[in-house]
Amino acid sequence: MYAVIVTGGKQYKVTEGEFLKIEKLELATGEAVTFDRVLLIGNGDDVKIGAPVVDGAKVVAEVVSQGRHDKVRIIKFRRRKHHMKRQGHRQWFTEIKITGIQA
């Protein structure tokens, strides 16, 4: 069984037991989180598509860890002007484990 959920402005296809890095949620490690915005649920040939969400469907997950992604380097450069600006960014994430999909 799989589902498509929305969190942090992004869509993720998830299955039970899968580990996933999503945008940061303010939750402690070990806490449970429920995703109610389920766009699609599939089980073999049986597929339920929401309009826009599937009624009564939810995905339950457990917070595994909080962390930061690898650094993304930004360079702004002006040719022939001896000007270069360097910057870096590390985005926070929450790693979750999908524990259940309920339709």
Curated annotation (Swiss-Prot):
Signal peptide: none
One annotated Gene Ontology cellular component of this protein: ribonucleoprotein complex
GO molecular function: rRNA binding; structural constituent of ribosome
Assigned keywords, A-Z: Ribonucleoprotein, Ribosomal protein, RNA-binding, rRNA-binding
Superkingdom as given in the UniProt entry: Bacteria
GO biological process: translation
PROSITE patterns (UniProt xref): RIBOSOMAL_L21
Subunit structure: Part of the 50S ribosomal subunit. Contacts protein L20.
Protein task: This protein binds to 23S rRNA in the presence of protein L20.
Family: Belongs to the bacterial ribosomal protein bL21 family.
This protein's name: Large ribosomal subunit protein bL21
Organism annotation: Ectopseudomonas mendocina (strain ymp) (Pseudomonas mendocina)
Gene assigned in the entry: rplU
